[in-house]
Amino acid sequence: MRGKVSLEEAFELPKFAAQTKEKAELYIAPNNRDRYFEEILNPCGNRLELSNKHGIGYTIYSIYSPGPQGWTERAECEEYARECNDYISGEIANHKDRMGAFAALSMHDPKQASEELTRCVKELGFLGALVNDVQHAGPEGETHIFYDQPEWDIFWQTCVDLDVPFYLHPEPPFGSYLRNQYEGRKYLIGPPVSFANGVSLHVLGMIVNGVFDRFPKLKVILGHLGEHIPGDFWRIEHWFEHCSRPLAKSRGDVFAEKPLLHYFRNNIWLTTSGNFSTETLKFCVEHVGAERILFSVDSPYEHIDVGCGWYDDNAKAIMEAVGGEKAYKDIGRDNAKKLFKLGKFYDSEA
């Protein structure tokens, strides 16, 4: 398929190449690191050539993980996020028909995060924000700032007012959490377990704490076909309905006003990033609808040729899985065009 839109694609500032290499040792195989470093530090290098070769018409770039969420000092974090945004804006300036960007944000303070998001959308033309799970603060990043509490309503209102999506992306564990949880099970860091554990806790916290009830027009994107949540749709809702909601009501606590699937069908989109499983895609489409699914690769953690090869080489099987050619094209391109209000781009009408 030509003109695919891919929207979970990472970069890092070249000045932090050494730190990037250190963090890559957590979950990038030794024989894959040279390619990884070349791509993550050069968003407009051979990745554009690979996009041409494999039918990606438009790429939305975002800062790599943990990005600003790993900066524990507020002032330094805000400076780094702004530098990331200015850098990627400059990098893609000559490729506006091929590339866009998500804002990197310091999430130490909701008001400042709102201001930087507004700057990025209104002045730099960015398409939303991507944040790498919780914001770390304090010694060794021991304080985890979640965005599911009422003090973050000012930020969510900004997202709604700007009418842009918020991508909640995973981050690697570090500090005492890394030592306590993963020192003896380091090969579960990243896609096998740790990424999904963090994001699923966070987005479910947003649901049960009423964020989407207070902001019914809020748009949130989850990668990797839902961070393990879809497989537990029934069990989560079963427990919400028969235990959690009655408990919350008896205690006078806030709780989600609607069934779990309501939020996944009205507020949340899922991407195929790093989860190139036709069977899992079919399951997600059956539960949330093809209109809630967006193609993505997750480069440079995943290979562009692998992600695109799955979608293109298995087109017939995927069409059967998702409900036909229209749904196939919607997932590959047209859902993203609608969500991000994209104009014409390379192969956008192919």
Swiss-Prot record:
The keyword ATP-binding does not apply. One of its GO terms (cellular component) is cytosol. Inhibited by AgNO(3), HgCl(2), p-chloromercuribenzoic acid and NiCl(2). GO terms for molecular function: carboxy-lyase activity; hydrolase activity. Pfam families: Amidohydro_2 (PF04909). Gene3D superfamilies: Metal-dependent hydrolases (3.20.20.140). It is an enzyme of class 4 (lyase). Keywords: Decarboxylase, Lyase. Optimum temperature is 40 degrees Celsius for the decarboxylase activity and 30 degrees Celsius for carboxylase activity. GO terms for biological process: secondary metabolic process. It catalyses: salicylate + H(+) = phenol + CO2. Its EC number is 4.1.1.91. Disulfide bonds: none annotated. Optimum pH is 5.5 for decarboxylase activity. Homotetramer. Belongs to the metallo-dependent hydrolases superfamily. Reversibly catalyzes the regioselective carboxylation of phenol to form salicylic acid. Involved in a pathway for the degradation of salicylate via phenol. Also catalyzes the decarboxylation of beta-resorcylic acid (2,4-dihydroxybenzoic acid) into resorcinol (1,3-dihydroxybenzene), gamma-resorcylic acid (2,6-dihydroxybenzoic acid) into resorcinol, 2,3-dihydroxybenzoic acid into catechol (1,2-dihydroxybenzene), and 4-aminosalicylic acid into 3-aminophenol. This is Salicylate decarboxylase. It comes from Cutaneotrichosporon moniliiforme (Yeast).
